[in-house]
A protein has these predicted regions:
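Active-site core segments that coordinate phosphate-bearing ligands/cofactors
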Residues: 1-39, 45, 50-61, 65-68, ...
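Gly/charged, well-structured mid-domain segments that form the phosphate/adenylate-handling core
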Residues: 80-87
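A conserved helix-loop-beta module that forms one wall/lid of the active-site cleft
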Residues: 67-79
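Positively charged, low-complexity/disordered segments
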Residues: 243-245
């Protein structure tokens, strides 16, 4: 994500490297290039890199001009769903695949997660917790948060005719909080699988117990405040380890 600012850093700090760049690619674009030999990208990918102007429905010329980027650095744009190339002979041999298989889809991790959960329409939300926690909601209008507390990307089914934007709220401390709970709720030792089974014993909503997982430093969603992690709603004679897990 945020490829534009990373590219600007390279341009300023490693100009010799910047001058050698032919095309910029997200990881998915690079993998597709290795599979097909074709360099291309998608609107969804460009929006994750902050290169897309939703009002103009084009590469963000104002941003390219601001950073002094040449438009030629942007790869050809292909539909998120549609033929983006075919597996070439080299990749087929390396991977044991049949040459000529079409590559027809690519997207980032959170749009992919939303796709897997059938989240496509305004008001629908996908949530996941891993290294970070993410709440990803689909919006049907072009707008943004002027405080940059959330990120807005083109969702996998976004088109010029049908606005479908993924609004991404990232909670950075979720993964490490899971590790903290593992170490401190059951210091005698417990696996993550056992934690999941223990948590399944609690009712939905954990009888009012909630954990604010902000123990990993400042959070952009809170305007860079450091609030710390806290457990709320716990009642000593009611709640058990299952609720906290």
């Amino acid at each position: 994500n945020f490829t534009a600012s990373k590219l600007a850093w390279i341009k300023e700090n490693e100009p010799a490297v910047y001058e050698r760049i032919y095309k910029i690619m997200l990881p998915g674009d690079y993998i597709a290039m290795k599979l097909t030999g074709d360099i291309c990208t998608t609107v969804s990918g460009l929006s994750e890199g902050m290169f897309w102007d939703f009002q103009a429905n084009d590469v963000a010329g104002f941003l390219m001009d601001y950073y002094g980027f040449d438009r030629s650095l942007i790869a050809d744009i292909k539909p998120t769903f549609g033929e983006q190339g075919r597996v070439n002979a080299w990749a087929a041999k390396e991977l044991g695949l049949k040459e000529g298989i079409p590559v027809t889809y690519r997207a980032g991790d959170q749009p992919n997660n939303a796709l897997s959960l059938n989240v496509f329409n305004p008001g629908e939300i996908a949530s996941t917790a891993g290294t970070s926690g993410v709440v990803y909601g689909v919006n049907g209008e072009v707008n943004y948060d002027p405080k940059s507390r959330v990120n807005t990307f083109a969702h996998v089914n976004h088109t010029a005719e049908q606005t479908r934007l993924g609004v991404l709220l990232c909670i950075n401390g979720t993964g490490i909080l899971n590790s903290w709970v593992k170490r401190n709720v059951a210091p005698e030792g417990i696996s993550y699988s056992d934690m999941n089974r223990l948590a399944a014993q609690a009712p939905v909503g954990s009888a009012g117990v909630s954990i604010l997982p902000f123990g990993n430093g400042a959070e952009r969603m809170l305007e860079n405040k450091e609030t710390g992690c806290s457990i709320c709603g716990a009642v000593s004679y009611t709640h058990l380890r299952a609720h906290e897990t």
